[in-house]
């Protein structure tokens, strides 16, 4: 109750620093600073105060778009004989490659298309009682790997690929993986912004005690959460969602400052 009364007495400007903590950031603060709770004299939405020092959670969240797409399509064909299966497969591959080209996906400057080796397997179906072979089937399959910087084209083509089924082509597409080529630079920038946010929070809190924030004493860099937009899911090990083109990245940093 003493803590609540003390916080209630804070002016609006200081409380706004605390209140603006997003749910995802607060959840991450609990994960990254949970070990401090037992020793803290005050712990409210990501900060604690002990004698001559203050520990706060700085956070930074931004939205960005992926610029790399990785996608694969497996093409299969069945036949009663090895040759029959392979010939059907060649026709299916031709239709699939033409479909991809029609949708703007072919090997070029901003895209790479790789054809994996074709494999042929024999499958035998046996009678459950006599164990006699009652059917022999050959399956030929081959994977097409696609790496592209045109992420929206990949997303659109993925949604249409099953149209090939209407042409008798057995395709098994994977879900596209969307990533970001400049993530290393983005992480450095996010940490800098999280550190700046930590100092702003520390100064707002210290002001109410008639104190000033001094030098940096300790930094606890947390994990990054890269999620679908507006997600509240967090992981203590960090996360990297690759299912969507648009993403949110959140960095959390526990920072201890000296208090004068």
Task: Set out the residue ranges of the language-model regions.
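Short, charge-dense linear interaction motifs
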Residues: 2-260
């Amino acid at each position: 109750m003493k803590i609540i009364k003390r916080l209630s007495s804070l002016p609006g400007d200081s409380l706004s620093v605390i209140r603006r903590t997003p749910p995802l950031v607060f959840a991450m603060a609990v994960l990254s600073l949970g070990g401090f709770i037992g020793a803290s004299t005050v712990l409210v939405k990501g900060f604690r105060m002990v004698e001559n020092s203050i520990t706060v959670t700085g956070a930074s969240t931004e939205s960005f778009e992926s610029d790399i797409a990785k996608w694969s399509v497996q093409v299969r064909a069945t036949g009663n004989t090895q040759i029959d299966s392979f010939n059907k497969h060649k026709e299916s591959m031709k239709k699939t490659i033409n479909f991809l080209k029609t949708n703007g996906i072919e090997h070029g400057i901003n895209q790479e298309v790789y054809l994996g080796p074709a494999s042929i397997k024999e499958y035998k179906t046996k009678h459950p009682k006599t164990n006699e072979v009652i059917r022999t089937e050959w399956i030929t399959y081959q994977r097409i790997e696609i790496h592209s910087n045109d992420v929206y084209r990949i997303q659109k083509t993925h949604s249409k690929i099953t149209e090939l089924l209407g042409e008798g082509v057995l395709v098994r597409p994977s879900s596209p993986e969307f990533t970001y080529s400049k993530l290393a630079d983005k992480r450095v920038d996010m940490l800098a912004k999280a550190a700046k946010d930590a100092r702003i929070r520390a100064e707002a809190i210290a002001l109410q005690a008639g104190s000033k924030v001094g030098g940096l004493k300790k930094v606890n860099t947390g994990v990054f959460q890269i999620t679908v937009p507006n997600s509240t899911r967090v992981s203590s090990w960090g996360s990297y969602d690759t299912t969507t083109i648009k993403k949110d990245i959140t960095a959390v940093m526990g920072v201890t400052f000296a208090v004068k």
